[in-house]
Amino acid sequence: MKTGMIICLLLIAFMDADGSPGDTLYSQKTADTDSGMKRFQKTFQKRRCVFCPKEPCCDGDQCMTAPGTGPFCG
């Protein structure tokens, strides 16, 4: 009985005012993982360099392409 009451009080303590779970460790970890994946994808795409089609840019004549967009200097 006491264990159930303690669990219930802990759940209430971590809830926001609207009754949804607050900033728990799990939700923060998920957000950090998502931002880490996005950061990794950006750096991976920047390493994939091709020659610029029209004019030289940033590093000599190399520029970067992102899927769905044109070439850009990074």
Curated annotation (Swiss-Prot):
Q: Would you name any one GO CC term? A: extracellular region
Organism's domain of life?
Answer: Eukaryota
Got any disulfides in this one, which pairs? C49-C58, C52-C63, C57-C73
**Signal peptide as annotated in the record:** 1-19
Which keywords does this chain's UniProt record carry?
Cleavage on pair of basic residues, Disulfide bond, Knottin, Neurotoxin, Secreted, Signal, Toxin
Q: Where in the cell is it found?
A: Secreted
GO molecular function, one example?
Answer: toxin activity
Identify this protein by name: Conotoxin Im6.10
